[in-house]
């Protein structure tokens, strides 16, 4: 929470006499650079973001009642949990158990930057987390002329082997977002932009588009500001990329294999990737050629039986 949060303001005023002092991680024997007269734990060194004590039942109850109010008053269908990797696992389990009672299809989406996503995702934790592992490969595989990177990342996460990490899960997949440089600024060759979106819409998971990127707008993450990533846009700028992404989204939406099917690499080179998504009664092949020249691939494509989605 911010320093202006009412319970924290009460602690600033009443110190150890505040009934909310245990809502935070506080040491009255210390101080801060803001001279509060006590030390408090903050998020990753940012003193304007005060860390709540999620082991305190009163804090948890306050949050749960707020969530209940949002559901009853506004009909929300889920929560995106910022920096979910910082949350205690026991708290995540409590949150999941509570929200399951509000709506059977209420979704918890957690932000996770790395590590084993199963730490925060599962039947008693978040339904899904952000797939930063494959986000990086979506652009660097093209820039480095190394489609092995994204191919191996997807196979590690979703491949047919019994040891793969997230088979059956729906990680949130993205090419850019509010915290990272936009895809159109990241890729060295603009012609690779539609190819990256083809992989995004074809790979397992739940694809997400960051506003404006469907038009191909650029934006660099700054050292001190994210303003360039988050412009105020007046009107849509529909173009060929927008139309291409709309076609990809429609193909995915109408395909059981692309939505829920298995994953298998069929062909993989530095500049080409073909992977298979398969569900009962449907087999889809996603083929991407990052080279500037045509490529002849030899594999079982089901000639005479296939059609272009």
Could you describe each region identified by the protein language model?
Residues 109-110, 207-212, 256-262, 307:
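Acidic/polar loop patches that form or flank catalytic/metal-binding clefts of enzymes
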Residues 45-60, 77-86, 139-145, 179-189, ...:
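The substrate-binding groove and active-site-proximal loops of carbohydrate-active enzymes
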């Amino acid at each position: 929470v911010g320093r202006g949060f009412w319970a924290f303001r009460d602690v600033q005023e009443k110190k150890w006499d505040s009934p909310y002092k245990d809502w935070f991680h506080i040491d009255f024997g210390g101080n801060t650079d803001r001279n509060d007269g006590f030390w408090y734990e903050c998020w990753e060194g940012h003193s304007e973001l005060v860390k709540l004590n999620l082991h305190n039942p009163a804090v948890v109850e306050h949050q749960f009642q707020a969530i209940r109010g949002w559901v009853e008053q506004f009909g929300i269908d889920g929560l995106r949990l910022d920096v979910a990797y910082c949350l205690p696992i026991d708290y995540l389990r409590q949150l999941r158990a509570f929200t399951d009672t509000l709506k059977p299809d209420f979704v918890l989406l957690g932000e996770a930057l790395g590590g084993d996503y199963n730490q925060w995702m599962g039947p008693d934790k978040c339904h899904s987390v952000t797939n930063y592992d494959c986000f990086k490969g979506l652009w660097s595989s093209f820039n480095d002329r190394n489609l092995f990177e994204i191919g191996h990342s997807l196979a590690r996460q979703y491949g047919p082997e019994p040891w793969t990490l997230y088979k059956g899960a729906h990680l949130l997949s993205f090419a850019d977002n509010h915290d990272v440089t936009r895809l159109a600024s990241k890729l060295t060759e603009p012609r690779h932009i539609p190819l990256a979106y083809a992989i995004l819409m074809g790979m397992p998971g739940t694809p997400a588009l960051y506003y404006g990127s469907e038009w191909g707008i650029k934006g660099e993450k700054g050292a001190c500001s994210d303003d360039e990533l988050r412009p105020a846009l007046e009107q849509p700028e529909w173009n060929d990329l927008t139309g291409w992404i709309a076609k990809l989204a429609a193909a995915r939406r109408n395909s059981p294999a692309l939505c829920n099917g298995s994953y298998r690499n069929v062909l993989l080179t530095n500049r080409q990737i073909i992977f298979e998504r398969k569900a009962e009664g449907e087999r889809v092949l996603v083929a991407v050629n990052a080279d500037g020249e045509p490529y002849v691939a030899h594999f079982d494509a089901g000639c005479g039986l296939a059609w272009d989605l």
